[in-house]
Amino acid sequence: MYDMFDYLEWRGDLPFKKIGPNPVDMLIFSTLSYINFDGIVSENPNKIIPLREAAEQFLVLPDKEKKVRVKKDIELLEAAVNTERFANVGVSFYRNVLAPEEEKQFAAITYYPGDGTAILTFRGTDRTLIGWKEENDR
């Protein structure tokens, strides 16, 4: 069975300007939205940096494994930014809110693949206590 890593090997050489985003790209963007880019990606939509640059800053963090859902997310980030397709995707408009006293969690990030579109992804329920409570309160 093929996975996102196989897809990156197969189509990683095709920039988004050549072939626009497809469902597998959206899955990759959604998965990457679970990475905690606090202090790396700006909340300001006008301060766009390449995903490669965000990854470089993230990957040197000593506690990076605590800032992801699963370790495979780190591997996916590394694999993605080592492709022509994802390396220069812009990222900004990042927001991560974790407010236990309000039982609130929210996270979103915007990707700019370079084909004239903006892709906004929202992080779903995570494995924090707030996420667990949020899931059970539905």
Give, region by region, the residue ranges found by the protein language model.
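N-terminal low-complexity, Ser/Thr- and acidic-residue-enriched intrinsically disordered segments
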Residues: M1-K72
